[in-house]
Design a protein with these regions (language model features):
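Intramembrane alpha-helical segments
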Residues: 1-91, 101-113, 212-222, 227-228
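Alpha-helical transmembrane segments
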Residues: 68-228
Length: 228
């Protein structure tokens, strides 16, 4: 999104994120995460907006090399698809399957497409923010306790964090480093995990595979332990 300042982007993100609690879709239970269970609606609404804005920016900020943002989103969607199909919530399964079907050909052209043959496509801010928004909505839907839709999911909050563990920790680390060095939080830099791996000698594809493998390991372990 060219020509739009970071603060204006953030304001628009807050506005669109506010649509969720206005539609009565918000985080109302942390399932024991940090010792917290049921939370008041007002607190849940504010938390929902904050979480959704964070996820949108996490997916956007980690989009630094070809295929990374889309790959991590695809992995998280696969985890959510497993959860929703297990609970037989087919509406969300259809949404996830459709989005995964879009991402797979995109990844092919984004990673292996030849720019000189006009075969390479890019995501940009609009694409990564949209992916982050949809992914955030699905995660919040999973975290919201509604006994009429889904039974009590012990560990739902922790599993949701795991699905986006790599972009979550990467954003936290980058923000902390920028604050410590008194740099603007919204200014782009080359301090993300993929930049670190490439400076260590990896190629773009090696860094991509390493980050995907790390994310997959955490997600598979937590999914196998979920509700056991």
């Amino acid at each position: 999104i060219f020509g739009v300042r970071a603060k204006k982007k953030l304001l628009m993100q807050i506005i669109v994120a506010s649509l969720l609690p206005m539609s009565y879709l918000y985080i109302n239970n942390l399932y024991g995460f940090l010792g917290i269970y049921e939370i008041p609606p007002l607190v849940g609404a504010v938390l929902t907006v904050g979480v959704l804005v964070f996820i949108m920016n996490a997916i956007n900020l980690i989009d630094g090399i070809d295929g990374l943002s889309a790959s991590l989103t695809l992995i998280a969607l696969a985890g959510l698809f497993f959860i929703f199909q297990r609970e037989r919530i087919w509406v969300y399964c259809i949404l996830i399957a459709g989005l995964m079907g879009v991402l797979i050909p995109f990844l092919y052209h984004n990673i292996w497409g030849k720019q000189e043959k006009n075969q390479k496509i890019f995501m940009g801010d609009s694409g990564s923010l949209t992916l982050g928004y949809i992914l955030g909505v699905l995660l919040i839907k999973f975290c919201m306790y509604n006994p009429h839709v889904m039974p009590y999911q012990k560990g739902a909050t922790l599993l949701s964090v795991t699905l986006l563990l790599v972009p979550t920790f990467d954003v936290f680390r980058v923000i902390i480093v920028r604050i410590l060095h008194q740099k603007p939080i919204f200014r782009a830099d080359k301090n993300h995990i993929h930049h670190k791996l490439m400076r260590a000698g990896m190629t773009q594809h090696q860094a991509l595979i390493s980050i995907i493998a790390l994310s997959l390991i955490f997600i598979i372990i937590n999914l196998s332990l979920f509700n056991q």
